[in-house]
């Protein structure tokens, strides 16, 4: 009887491989890793739930996190593009904002796996490698640094990394999210990395831009003044 077609038991078939360099304990390591995946999925689900609610409530289309003039200039870099409607740069601005936010969250999850509070470029590379929708960035983001850092989650057995090029597992986004979740602060750029506040705030406070402080490090708003400055550039 041919045994090559035998299927593994459900408990083994449903376990995704952990990230490269991840260390788990020999006893209960699989359950611990599944719990980590569930927590990460809940955080991503909370992020997208809040973003959908925010988009539905938007009534200000004049001020944007990213300058529309810069986006329009990038769009016009394509010689085949002759005319651009007023709505197109607005949609691109929001799409770029969501792209940056999601990649930041996924990068922060990798930093937390490595017990760090500093988001580094190797975290961004890891987030790109483990997420198939970001595979178009693989060739422009160095991945060698991922191998240099061992993610220590506890003493025990080191699990072998997955095959190169295979995106790591995340549960489908459609799964219901449980309560709670990770919260991160606004990123502050620094030559040595992106410093992120510990997860102690609510999701709403994470993505809202404070208006009354002078030390706000969130992305600058586009507005008419920003557009005028960019239009004046060569």
UniProtKB/Swiss-Prot annotation:
Biased composition (Pro residues): 7-20
Expression by tissue: Ubiquitous. Present in etiolated seedlings.
Pfam family name, one: Histone
Top-level taxon: Eukaryota
Entries under SUPFAM superfamilies matching the protein: Histone-fold
Gene Ontology MF term list: DNA binding; DNA-binding transcription factor activity; protein heterodimerization activity
Nucleus keyword on record: yes
Segments for region (Disordered): 1-20, 205-234
Summary of subunit composition and partner proteins: Heterotrimeric transcription factor composed of three components, NF-YA, NF-YB and NF-YC. NF-YB and NF-YC must interact and dimerize for NF-YA association and DNA binding.
Protein name: Nuclear transcription factor Y subunit C-1
The species this protein was found in: Arabidopsis thaliana
Gene: NFYC1
């Amino acid at each position: 009887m041919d045994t090559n077609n035998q299927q593994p038991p459900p408990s083994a078939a449903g376990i995704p491989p952990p990230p490269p360099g991840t260390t788990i304990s020999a006893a209960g390591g699989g359950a611990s890793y599944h719990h980590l995946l569930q927590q990460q999925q809940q955080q991503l689900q909370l992020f997208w739930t809040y973003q959908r609610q925010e988009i539905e409530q938007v009534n200000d289309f004049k001020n944007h996190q990213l300058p529309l003039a810069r986006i329009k200039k990038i769009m016009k870099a394509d010689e085949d593009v002759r005319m651009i409607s007023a709505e197109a740069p607005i949609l691109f601005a929001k799409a770029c904002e969501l792209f940056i936010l999601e990649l930041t969250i996924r990068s922060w999850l990798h930093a937390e796996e490595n017990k760090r509070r500093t988001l580094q470029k190797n975290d961004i590379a890891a987030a790109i490698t483990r997420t198939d929708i970001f595979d178009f960035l693989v060739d422009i983001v160095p991945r060698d640094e991922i191998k240099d850092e061992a993610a220590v989650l506890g003493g025990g057995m080191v699990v072998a990394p997955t095959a190169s090029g295979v995106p790591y597992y995340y549960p489908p986004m459609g799964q219901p999210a449980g309560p709670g979740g990770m919260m991160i602060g606004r990123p502050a750029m620094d030559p040595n990395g992106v410093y992120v506040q510990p997860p102690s705030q609510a999701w709403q406070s994470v993505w809202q831009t404070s208006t009354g402080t002078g030390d706000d490090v969130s992305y600058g708003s586009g507005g008419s003044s920003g557009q005028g400055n960019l239009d004046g550039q060569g």
